């Protein structure tokens, strides 16, 4: 810890008091005073106002993909702010055009891009596009969406309705109509699913039971992230795509967390050989240096909106979505990922980190260690044979022990009652070998506290 003078200590204490008084840290409940107040950051490390350094093994909220302190991103935004600080996409500007083109390169297809600010907004946009698309194609009954239990898709009403986490919905219901849920794929708790693909078959049955003609689409993350890093069978997503095609539904892929290299591919769906109709993205698009999200739609969907009737157009406006500075910064962010081969680095470092954490399987409370790229989950259980989930208190002990040792890790809190039992790791791609060793050492030591 850096030395602090008495004046700095007093200023810091005052800052903590004001933080507790004025800033609502909703997920912390009654424990507002426990907040780490970040002051500066570089690479994978964050320094708080007490001068203490922490390795951020969650990239903020799964989003600072290229790491902290990249001055090139700040400079890209600054130069754009000087030239054109704002213009709405009711018209256009060069950074948005260039970024949309670049995203098409990354997606490997012919997509048209709608810009917003957050993952929740990107998913809300996708729902509206899908419903109107079917209407304009003459399918007037298609309004329902299928998602999976344990998945998270956002905190706005539509995105929360798609979310399969009851603890995130409780006290905010009733939510939007037309959202259905299927059991999630989870090869740890249901290893037979790798052969039977029963979790995909359930989506097929739901479409039949609900009447195919009423299903607008299926929304899914390639890997369920916030719900516990649930790994699907290899053939799962491809089968769901085939089911969607057979029933006339759209496949919407939520890449808000899995996208931009997090799983070791540009986008998570690329592991599974599918071509989604709609793709939503946020977080890593700017490495969180500025708010930006996008909803990418296949060109044939976009073409359905080109009619001349008064309500044929997509009547959806976003004031700040696709701001010039955010788009310019995103372009620089993607350029850095390309130039420094950070997606390959995510793949390689992720494989090494996952491999070194496998030793935790010997711990009596660890049931599974899993992941892809720099997206890793460690599931805690009471009993390895029955796989009964561990209490959240055990998870909290490990998280607290890591923080005390200078490591920030995540957990799947407030999701499904009884299943908040997964430690989560999603460090920045700029992680050094020394950083990786620190994560492994600290996590292993912290498990010795339970």
UniProtKB/Swiss-Prot annotation:
Record PTM N6-(pyridoxal phosphate)lysine, positions in chain: 283
Top-level enzyme category: transferase
Entry's Gene Ontology BP terms: biotin biosynthetic process; glycerol metabolic process
Molecular function in Gene Ontology: adenosylmethionine-8-amino-7-oxononanoate transaminase activity; pyridoxal phosphate binding
Keywords: Aminotransferase, Glycerol metabolism, Pyridoxal phosphate, Transferase
Cofactor dependency: pyridoxal 5'-phosphate
EC number of the protein: 2.6.-.-
InterPro entries from the UniProt entry: Aminotrans_3, Aminotrans_3_PPA_site, PyrdxlP-dep_Trfase, PyrdxlP-dep_Trfase_major, PyrdxlP-dep_Trfase_small
Pfam families, A to Z: Aminotran_3
Family: Belongs to the class-III pyridoxal-phosphate-dependent aminotransferase family.
Function: Essential for glycerol catabolism.
Protein name per its UniProtKB record: Uncharacterized aminotransferase YhxA
